[in-house]
From Swiss-Prot:
It catalyses: 2 a phenolic donor + H2O2 = 2 a phenolic radical donor + 2 H2O. This is Peroxidase 1. It comes from the Eukaryota. Removal of H(2)O(2), oxidation of toxic reductants, biosynthesis and degradation of lignin, suberization, auxin catabolism, response to environmental stresses such as wounding, pathogen attack and oxidative stress. These functions might be dependent on each isozyme/isoform in each plant tissue.
Length: 9
């Protein structure tokens, strides 16, 4: 989502 917190998709 933001930065790299929930960008693990």
């Amino acid at each position: 989502g933001f930065d790299v917190v929930d960008n693990i998709k």
